[in-house]
Amino acid sequence: MMPRLQEKYEKEVVSALMDKFGYKNIMEVPKLEKIVINMGVGEAKENQKSLEAAVEDLAKITGQKPILTKAKKSVANFKIREDMPLGCKVTLRKQNMYEFADKLINVALPRVRDFSGVSSKSFDGRGNYAIGIKEQLIFPEIEFDKIDKIRGMDIIFVTTAKTDEEARELLRFLGMPFAR
């Protein structure tokens, strides 16, 4: 069964984007390529348990096992050594990606306190969009009394769009609530 958001993309978004930007070929239409969710756990250098908890939370949220991210080089001021695990990340593609995007847009973001939309300035110039989330509690899979600490995460939407404007329209048509 095709995820709801993927169906919406194929049935409505493609034609809307073709009209708006005047693409001649359906393959030119930008699409979501992947969603990368990254959780940096600063206190992992002293406390390995916190990293395990972060991995568990991320696995619950995404339904996929995260990989550990390690320090690229040693930095004495931060008390980190090379190859020390400092966080975790998940890369979602295809069905998992659409299901996660649907859950984020329709369930998680509306649960953010004082939510007025996501910033439309977080594009990187190459058609990718990044959003920071301050607490993992906005996801329905996370139970308040089961977590040890509130953690945030970065979510990056990687699209095939050439420009930020095309990427913004793609995400807007998919339902991303941009602030006015």
From Swiss-Prot:
InterPro entries in the cross-refs: Ribosomal_uL5 (IPR002132), Ribosomal_uL5_bac-type (IPR020930), Ribosomal_uL5_C (IPR031309), Ribosomal_uL5_CS (IPR020929), Ribosomal_uL5_dom_sf (IPR022803), Ribosomal_uL5_N (IPR031310)
One example GO MF annotation: rRNA binding
Keyword terms of this UniProt record: Ribonucleoprotein, Ribosomal protein, RNA-binding, rRNA-binding, tRNA-binding
Pfam families: Ribosomal_L5, Ribosomal_L5_C
Top-level taxon: Bacteria
PROSITE patterns found in the cross-reference section: RIBOSOMAL_L5 (PS00358)
Biological process, per Gene Ontology: translation
One annotated Gene Ontology cellular component of this protein: cytosolic large ribosomal subunit
Oligomer status and interactors: Part of the 50S ribosomal subunit; part of the 5S rRNA/L5/L18/L25 subcomplex. Contacts the 5S rRNA and the P site tRNA. Forms a bridge to the 30S subunit in the 70S ribosome.
Family: Belongs to the universal ribosomal protein uL5 family.
Annotated function: This is one of the proteins that bind and probably mediate the attachment of the 5S RNA into the large ribosomal subunit, where it forms part of the central protuberance. In the 70S ribosome it contacts protein S13 of the 30S subunit (bridge B1b), connecting the 2 subunits; this bridge is implicated in subunit movement. Contacts the P site tRNA; the 5S rRNA and some of its associated proteins might help stabilize positioning of ribosome-bound tRNAs.
Protein name stated in the entry: Large ribosomal subunit protein uL5
